C-alpha cells in the first residue's frame, strides 16, 4: 500500500485531498498545526485503519517513521485575513517548512508536490495567466508575505529537484471553493454567502469590475491527483477559466440565496489583483484535465453546506486566536 503524507490536512483543500487518497487506497498520514485548520474537517477519518494524524508544525523538524512514497505540501495560511495577522509564520511555513519537507522527501526518496498559487502572478499584466508569465508583484506590500513565500517555495523546490534529484511537482492553484471553506476567512465566496445568510448587505471592495475564476474543489483535487502522478516537474495552473466580475458574482449569490440584500462598496485593498484567470492549456495537454463542475452547480452544493451551519457558526467573527503564533 502506497503511503502519502499530506500537510495542511485539516484545512479546506487538504481535508478533501485526504478523502481522495483514502478513496484511492492509499495509507494517508495527515499533519497540521491547526493554526487555521479544523479537526472537524477530518474527524470522519480517525476511525479508519489507513489514516493517522500528527499535530505538528512543519517549521520544526519533521519525522515520519517508516516508508513514504508521496508528500503533498498544503500547509500554509492562505487567506488574507490570516496571513496579515501572522505574516512571519506565513513566511516561515513557505521557507523553513518547505525546506524541511523537501529534506524529508530526499531522505525517504518520496515524490513531493507543493501547493503554489495564482498569487505568484501578483496583479497580472498578462491575461489570462500562463505558467511562463513571471508576474507583477510587490515584495513589501501587504500581500507580499504570502506571495513571496510561495515564490520562494517554488524556487527551493526546483533547486532540490535540480541539485538533489528529488522528484518534485508544483501546482499553481487558482481560486477554489466548496464545502469546508471557513465562513469567516475573508474570501469572497464565504463572505458573500455568510452575509446573505445573516441578512447583511453584500460587501464589494472596489467598483466590482475586478474578475475572478472559481474552481470547484472536486475539480481541483482531480487536477492535483493527476499532476502528482505525471512526469512533469514544472509549475502547472489548475483552475477554472470561467471568468466573472465580482459585481456579477454578487448578483448570482443574491439570486442563489433568494435574498434581497443590497450591495455596498468599499475601497479596494492595496495590491488586490484586478484580473485573475488561468490559462489551463498545459493541464489539458499534459494531464488531460479540465474543470467539469459549472459555477452554478458548485455554488449550489457550497451554499447548501453553509446553510447547514449553526447560527453560532454563522455569527462567529474570528476563526482562531493567533496571539500565541505572533512571533
Predicted regions and their residues:
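N-terminal Rossmann-like NAD(P)+-binding domain of SDR-like oxidoreductases, especially those catalyzing
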Residues: 1-176, 293, 301, 305-309, ...
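C-terminal substrate-binding subdomain of Rossmann-fold SDR/epimerase-dehydratase oxidoreductases
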Residues: 17, 175, 194-327
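Short, conserved catalytic or interaction motifs in soluble domains
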Residues: 36, 179, 240
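Short, surface-exposed alpha-helical segments at coil->helix boundaries
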Residues: 39-42, 154, 190, 247, ...
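Short, solvent-exposed loop/turn segments at secondary-structure boundaries
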Residues: 85-86, 180-184
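A glycine/serine/threonine-rich, flexible loop-to-helix segment
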Residues: 127-128, 183-191
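Conserved donor sugar-nucleotide recognition element shared by glycan-biosynthetic enzymes
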Residues: 145, 153, 185, 246, ...
Amino acid at each position: 500500500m502506497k503511503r502519502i503524507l499530506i500537510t495542511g490536512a485539516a484545512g479546506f483543500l487538504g481535508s478533501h485531498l485526504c478523502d481522495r487518497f483514502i478513496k484511492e487506497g492509499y495509507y494517508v498520514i495527515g499533519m497540521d498545526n491547526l493554526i487555521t485548520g479544523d479537526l472537524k474537517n477530518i474527524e470522519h477519518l480517525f476511525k479508519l485503519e489507513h489514516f493517522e494524524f500528527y499535530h505538528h508544525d512543519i517549521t520544526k523538524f519533521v519525522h515520519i517513521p517508516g516508508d513514504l512514497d508521496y508528500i503533498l505540501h498544503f500547509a500554509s495560511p492562505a487567506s488574507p485575513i490570516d496571513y496579515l495577522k501572522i505574516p512571519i509564520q506565513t513566511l516561515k511555513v513557505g521557507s523553513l517548512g518547505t525546506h524541511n519537507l523537501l529534506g524529508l522527501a530526499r531522505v525517504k526518496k518520496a515524490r513531493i508536490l507543493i501547493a503554489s498559487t495564482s498569487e505568484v502572478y501578483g496583479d497580472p499584466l498578462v491575461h489570462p495567466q500562463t505558467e511562463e508569465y513571471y508576474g507583477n508583484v510587490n515584495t513589501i506590500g501587504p500581500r507580499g508575505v504570502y506571495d513571496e513565500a510561495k515564490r520562494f517555495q517554488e524556487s527551493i523546490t526546483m533547486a532540490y529537484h535540480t541539485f538533489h534529484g528529488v522528484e518534485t511537482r508544483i501546482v499553481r492553484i487558482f481560486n477554489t471553493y466548496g464545502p469546508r471553506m471557513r465562513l469567516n476567512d475573508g474570501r469572497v465566496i464565504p463572505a458573500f454567502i455568510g452575509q446573505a445568510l445573516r441578512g447583511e448587505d453584500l460587501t464589494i471592495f472596489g467598483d466590482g469590475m475586478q474578475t475572478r475564476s472559481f474552481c470547484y474543489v472536486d475539480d481541483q483535487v482531480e487536477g492535483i491527483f493527476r499532476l502528482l502522478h505525471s512526469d512533469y516537474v514544472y509549475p502547472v495552473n489548475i483552475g477554472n477559466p470561467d471568468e466573472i466580475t465580482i459585481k456579477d458574482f454578487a448578483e448570482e449569490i443574491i439570486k442563489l440565496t433568494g435574498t434581497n440584500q443590497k450591495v455596498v462598496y468599499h475601497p479596494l485593498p492595496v495590491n488586490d489583483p484586478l484580473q485573475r484567470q488561468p490559462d489551463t492549456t498545459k493541464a489539458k495537454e499534459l494531464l488531460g484535465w479540465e474543470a467539469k463542475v459549472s459555477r452554478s452547480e458548485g455554488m449550489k452544493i457550497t451554499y447548501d453546506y453553509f446553510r447547514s451551519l449553526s447560527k453560532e457558526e454563522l455569527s462567529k467573527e474570528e476563526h482562531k486566536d493567533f496571539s500565541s503564533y505572533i512571533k
